[in-house]
Amino acid sequence: MPVVTMKQLLEAGVHFGHRTRRWNPKMAPYIYTERKGIYIIDLQKTQQLLEEAYYFVREKASEGATILFVGTKKQAQGVIKAEAERCGAFYVNNRWLGGLLTNFKTIRSRIDKLIELEEMEQSGKLEELPKKEQSRIRRVLEKLRKNLGGLKEMRRLPDIIYIVDPRKEKIAVAEANKLGIPIVAIVDTNCDPDPIDYVIPGNDDAIRSIKLITSVIADAYLEGREGAPLTAEKEETESAEETSEEVTEDINLEELEEEEEV
């Protein structure tokens, strides 16, 4: 039985690509036809490739692998957060910070700062500070939560990255490629499929399409984790502790507050 039916794909509008004037010729093998100026994606290929991605993620998860969900476009933000939290994945749904993977040591220090400030807030220590300082810290805290809130438990680089719209998330794609981290992605007709290890041809603009495909990947990760051996979990914990000890660079509030938007 397929992990997703043709009926589900059709009802979610997964087959609708972009207008013919906005396309990448490398996506030609995944296009079925053109209708009223819009490319129609071959759902048989989508079904087959989604299944391949599903089994890849499930197998890796059963070995203790971690996965990072990435989708910062408006249509993807809510789905990415909900599905990542459901399956226990890390996620980025607001803005990809340059160097998140290639300079993870520095990013991890910012995550640690987020955790530190949240502990101050929860313990009541923040309320003991002068009002002006409280306001400044809360601004920093809100910014950190938006950008790094889905990464608090990520103590090392992820083993897999799942991306909605690799064209928009080109920096994430480049960083993952540089580090040899396999990418699973929804690839629309205007995207370049070459940098993607597991291409899922599909509509990356419709919420229903994004939700259907993302839920399949989340299911795969969840099912794999449930059967993951304890030894893999133990190794991950030990690796996390080693990575945590390596982080020495301190990021102060002023630097965080003044950080330029990408």
Swiss-Prot record:
Origin: domain of life: Bacteria
UniProt entry tagged with the keyword Ribonucleoprotein: yes
Stretches with biased composition (Acidic residues): 235-262
A Gene Ontology biological process term: translation
Alphabetic keyword roster: Ribonucleoprotein, Ribosomal protein
Similarity-based family: Belongs to the universal ribosomal protein uS2 family.
HAMAP family according to UniProt: Ribosomal_uS2_B
Gene: rpsB
Name of the protein this chain belongs to: Small ribosomal subunit protein uS2
SUPFAM superfamilies (UniProt xref): Ribosomal protein S2
GO-annotated cellular components: cytosolic small ribosomal subunit
Cysteine-cysteine disulfides: none
GO function term, MF aspect, one: structural constituent of ribosome
Any one Pfam family match given in the protein's UniProt record, by short name: Ribosomal_S2
Annotated segments matching region Disordered: 226-262
